[in-house]
Swiss-Prot record:
A motif (Cx2C motif 2) lies at residues 286-289. Residues 140-204 are annotated as: Linker. This is Fe-S cluster assembly protein DRE2. The gene is DRE2. It is found in: Cytoplasm; Mitochondrion intermembrane space. Monomer. Interacts with TAH18. Interacts with MIA40.
Length: 312
């Protein structure tokens, strides 16, 4: 057998020391010499509480809290909080014990004792805090449907002498006492319900009441749901169509025919603006003339604008 396998069977001990004890190396060394150095580990409670170190999972059979330098447990219990106790419960093997090194485990005061119980530890008859051992067991659950005692196609399903199927380890076991479970294959009495029969014509013609949460708020237009059934989607669609029709109507009113275009198109020979002075220059042009800034040109001469550059 390998040395690692031998050490794995030896109980492991974890010593948790308060900071005050580390200030006295002689006393700490005396406590460490009481345990085999191959099977014991030492951790400082303050470093564990600060999250600077972490404990391995399911490793130790015994976790010992060392008392303070003055022999009390004030400093240890102050540092042992919920996070530390959760790590202790996790690092203990099932059946592992947590106590003080002098055996005064019952002296662990509140709230540390309550936090230890909430972390998963329980108190035994000696007052020690122990990590419980959860045994694996199978539970028999009868699975049966009591209907008529029939068989399908020569297969007798109503056999009560069949042995239950025992599954391995902690898996729920079902007993095979199914009484005519396939009886529904012969004739199903369930009838399909016509959805149209659930609502009459009066209910269909009734106006849809819009829920308060679907009503648009002031200053904000609410979007309809993807599967809208309250009528908001139809209302918004009608509003969009009405606005589009109004916009098209206004746009058509601004359209000019060929004759009207010729009246204001100065590139057509013989056509001038209402003032008749657009081609004479800025001195003769109106304030709103589109040709302000252009040099004088002859009536009928083509004028193009490219990037604010005038080309005649």
């Amino acid at each position: 057998m390998s040395p690692a396998a031998i050490l794995s069977d030896v109980p492991r001990v974890l010593l948790l020391s308060p900071p005050s004890l580390s200030s006295n190396p002689d006393k700490l060394a005396e406590l460490l010499n009481q345990y085999d150095k191959n099977t014991r580990d030492l951790q400082m409670i303050d470093r564990l509480a600060a999250g600077l170190v972490s404990l391995p999972e399911s490793t130790y059979n015994l976790v010992l809290l060392l008392t303070d330098i003055d022999g009390t447990s004030t400093e240890s219990e102050r540092l042992v909080g919920r996070d530390v106790l959760q790590q202790i419960a996790r690092t203990l093997q099932p059946g592992g014990i947590m106590k003080y090194h002098d055996g005064l485990s019952a002296m662990i005061k509140e709230p540390a004792r309550t936090e230890a119980i909430l972390s998963g530890l329980i108190a035994n008859d000696k007052g020690e805090l122990v990590k419980p051992v959860f045994e694996e067991q199978s539970v028999l659950l009868p699975f049966s449907i009591n209907r008529s005692q029939k068989s399908i196609k020569g297969i007798n399903i109503n056999k009560s002498d069949q042995q239950p199927a025992i599954l391995q380890k902690n898996i729920v076991t079902l007993t095979n006492n199914t009484n005519d479970i396939f009886n529904g294959l012969e004739g199903d009495d369930d009838e399909l319900i016509d959805e149209d029969e659930l609502i009459n014509e009066d209910e269909l013609e009734r106006p849809i009441i819009q829920p308060p949460e679907c009503r648009p708020k002031a200053g904000k237009r609410r979007r309809a749901c993807k599967d809208c059934t309250c009528g908001l989607a139809q209302k918004l669609e009608a509003e969009d169509k009405r606005q589009r029709a109004n916009a098209d109507e206004k746009l058509s009113a601004l359209k000019l025919n060929s004759g009207e275009i010729a009246e204001v198109d100065f590139t057509i020979q013989g056509k001038t603006g209402s003032c008749g002075n657009c081609s004479l220059g800025d001195a003769f042009r109106c304030d709103g003339c589109p040709y302000i800034g252009l040099p004088p040109f002859k009536p009928g001469e083509e004028v193009k604008l490219f990037d604010n550059d005038v080309q005649l």
